[in-house]
């Protein structure tokens, strides 16, 4: 039965490729910036923007975006709760003197979809019973944290994303010398990678393979000067995670697409989380990365303020046409938000330089 419910390879590939489409320029810095700018107009959240792109903004079928299937949209619906319901924090006041000088944590968006896509989500969930829909859209709060339920395809995509985040991002960080042999091991042990834990991993591997390499040896090889050895170790970590993925049944849901979920078996789930913590500690939260994220936050906010101040002057012709057709101020702000959210880092930087930086930008330079 389970094999019949698993998504077609093309479908799950499409879900994986599509799930981050809504991320704005400069990653979380851009997301915080747009949520700050849109706090009085419905907010902003990257995953919610993905749903908006797929069903409205992408130019394939007028008014329906890429016109994807219901199951694909269910697969990318990570947080089935509207912004207005998920946002419990009181809005912080705007800072008109220096609008870009904000603390990221004050304007971090809730996990949600945008209110503009309520009808889309209603259509996505239409095949499910009222009870299933109610449980999915009203996730419980456990230990002060909202616990979201996922559909089967979403759980597979999330699992793949987590494995990539912890292993392939580690590979990139090692290549860039952001993570070294010297700083990796203290951070890994602090995250829970003790000798006893590594021994537990080895016991699991030994029970499955006649010939095996200890997990500590695999991790040490990540720092080999030989790139082939490093690649082989990365491949081994990915393989260990993949072969320990399982499907479990959540009895609170009736429909199998909601009741069945993919998960990573212990202790490999802990290993994945430990590697993820290393990346967060040594890379994501490092001052060098945070400096760039803050700079991106400033670029996005100042672009938004310039575009909303004089949209006819600064918006591209097609975008301005959409802007003037918007039914109210809230919808007009959303047009500006959509335009900026669709930029790459490079495009946003070039547009910023053209508008704000003397001696930079030219009418002959294409964006």
Predicted regions and their residues:
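A residue-level signal for conserved active-site and pocket-lining positions in enzyme catalytic cores
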Residues: 50, 300, 340
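C-terminal structured interaction module
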Residues: 314, 335-367
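Sequence-structural signature of the catalytic-core scaffold of metal-dependent phosphohydrolases
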Residues: 1-14, 21-227, 238
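Hydrophobic (often cysteine-bearing) scaffold residues that line and stabilize catalytic clefts
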Residues: 26, 30, 46, 156, ...
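Non-catalytic regulatory/linker segments of enzymes
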Residues: 7-10, 293, 321, 355-367
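Charged/polar positions within long, soluble alpha-helices
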Residues: 88, 165-168, 172, 243, ...
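C-terminal subdomains that position terminal phosphate/3'-OH groups for nucleotidyl transfer/ligation
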Residues: 196-331, 343
């Amino acid at each position: 039965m389970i094999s019949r419910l698993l998504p077609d390879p093309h479908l799950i590939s499409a879900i994986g490729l599509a799930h981050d489409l809504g991320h704005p320029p400069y990653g979380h810095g851009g997301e915080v910036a747009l949520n700050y700018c849109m706090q009085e107009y419905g907010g902003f959240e990257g995953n919610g923007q993905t749903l908006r792109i797929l069903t409205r903004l992408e130019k394939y079928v007028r008014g329906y975006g890429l016109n994807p299937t219901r199951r694909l949209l269910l697969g990318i619906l990570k947080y089935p709760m509207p912004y207005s319901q998920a946002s419990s924090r009181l809005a912080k006041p705007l800072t008109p003197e220096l609008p870009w000088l904000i603390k990221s944590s004050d304007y971090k968006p809730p996990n949600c979809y945008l209110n503009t896509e309520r009808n889309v989500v209603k259509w996505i969930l239409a095949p499910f019973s009222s009870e299933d829909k109610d449980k999915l859209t009203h996730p419980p709060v456990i230990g002060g944290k909202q616990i979201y339920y996922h559909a089967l395809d979403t759980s597979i995509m999330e699992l793949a994303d987590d494995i990539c985040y912890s292993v392939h991002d580690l590979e990139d960080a090692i290549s860039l010398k952001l993570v070294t042999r010297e700083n990796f091991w203290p951070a890994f042990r602090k995250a829970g990678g003790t000798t006893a834990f590594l021994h537990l991993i080895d016991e699991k591997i030994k029970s499955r393979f006649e010939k095996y390499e200890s997990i500590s040896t695999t991790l040490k090889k990540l720092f080999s000067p030989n790139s082939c050895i490093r690649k082989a170790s990365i491949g081994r970590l990915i393989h260990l995670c993949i072969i320990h993925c399982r499907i479990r049944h959540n009895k609170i849901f009736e429909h199998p697409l909601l009741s069945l979920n993919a998960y990573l078996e212990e202790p490999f789930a802990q290993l994945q989380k430990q590697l993820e913590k290393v990346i967060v500690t040594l890379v994501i939260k490092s001052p060098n990365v945070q400096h760039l994220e803050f700079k991106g936050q400033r670029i996005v906010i100042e672009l938004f303020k310039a575009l909303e101040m004089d949209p006819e002057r600064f918006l591209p012709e097609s975008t301005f046409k959409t802007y003037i057709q918007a039914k109210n101020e809230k919808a007009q702000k959303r047009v500006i938000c959509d335009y900026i959210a669709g930029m790459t880092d490079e495009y946003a930087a070039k547009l910023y330089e053209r508008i704000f930086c003397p001696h930079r930008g030219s009418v002959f330079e294409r964006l």
